[in-house]
UniProtKB/Swiss-Prot annotation:
GO terms for molecular function: 8-oxo-7,8-dihydroguanine DNA N-glycosylase activity; class I DNA-(apurinic or apyrimidinic site) endonuclease activity; damaged DNA binding; zinc ion binding. Keywords: DNA damage, DNA repair, DNA-binding, Glycosidase, Hydrolase, Lyase, Metal-binding, Multifunctional enzyme, Zinc, Zinc-finger. Belongs to the FPG family. A zinc finger (FPG-type) spans 237-271. Monomer. Its cofactor is Zn(2+). Its EC number is 3.2.2.23, 4.2.99.18. GO terms for biological process: base-excision repair. This is Formamidopyrimidine-DNA glycosylase.
Length: 280
């Protein structure tokens, strides 16, 4: 699934040729995504100018003077900017044709992404209004995280993947951040000290920033808008490396399942305070 770095890479990739352009038309080949695409967009969008392209969590927000397109890439989606004469292939579900001769093409084999339209204030949309702070902003800091940890028995990995706590820390980057912080993923969130919260906050920021610089992580379907894979996979320390040697101590990387998601860790470098503590 594309996570924050992949979505930010997409935003940066499409921005130069999409922002500031008038929409000529939208072609909806298959609107059966996670939520049905509003067929009235065929009438609503032509003539509108894309004023800005922003990201909130894993949502791309295309602003016009009449409303916003809210795009989510789902499990397997990607966006590419192509010449308008480029023929569509299987799973190319939506094209946004622009006045500069290019189009924004949405490709999604599993069709779990979404294209939504809203004319209400964007910050009040039901998908956005309850989200936590962006991890790369000053609002996400050690003091904030430590305060949120108090009284929470949830496993720390599950906790930092909660979008109401902080947005965009998906499975790959949660595993990597915890490894660099020396924190076992199953530890109760409330067990972290302020020092550990400080380390974890810093590593979440550095891991996400590094992933954005590398164009994200391509594990299966994700491609950047120019059709290239992300290269952060080459820098992964623990994610997807079960039974391979830890890059710090050569112990075997282990794997457990937390909240239906895989957690990868080195039990030597990431100590569990008490293996009898119940987690959820």
């Amino acid at each position: 699934m594309p996570e924050l770095p992949e979505v930010e890479t997409t935003r940066k990739g499409i921005q130069p040729k999409v922002e500031g352009q008038a929409i000529q038309k939208i072609i909806i080949r298959n609107g059966k995504l996670r939520w049905p695409v509003d067929p009235s967009l065929v009438e609503k969008l032509p003539g509108l100018v894309v004023l800005s392209i922003k990201r909130r969590a894993k949502y791309l927000l295309l602003e016009t003077d009449q409303g916003h397109l809210i795009i989510h890439l789902g499990m397997s989606g990607n966006l590419r900017v192509l010449p308008q004469h480029e023929p569509a292939v299987k799973h190319d579900h939506i094209d946004l044709l622009l006045e500069n001769g290019f189009l924004l093409r949405y490709h999604d084999p599993r069709r779990f992404g979404s294209w939504l339209w809203t004319e209400a204030p964007i910050q009040e949309h039901s998908l956005l209004k309850s989200l936590g702070p962006e991890p790369l902003t000053d609002a996400f800091n050690a003091e904030y995280l430590f305060q949120k940890l108090q009284g929470r028995k949830t496993a720390i990995k599950t906790f930092i993947m909660n979008n109401q706590i902080v947005v965009g820390v998906g499975n790959i980057y949660a595993n990597e951040s915890l490894f660099l912080s020396g924190i076992h993923p199953t530890r109760p969130a409330q067990s972290l000290t302020l020092t550990e919260a400080t380390k974890l906050t810093a590593h979440i920021k550095t891991v996400l920033s590094a992933a954005i610089e590398q164009g994200g992580t391509t594990l299966k379907d994700f491609l950047t808008p120019d059709g290239k894979p992300g290269y952060f996979e080459q820098k992964l320390n623990v994610y997807g490396r079960e039974n391979l040697p830890c890059p710090q101590c050569d112990s075997a990387i282990e794997k457990v399942v937390l909240n239906q998601r895989a957690a990868y860790f080195c039990s030597n470098c990431q100590k569990q305070l008490d293996s009898t503590v119940k987690i959820k």
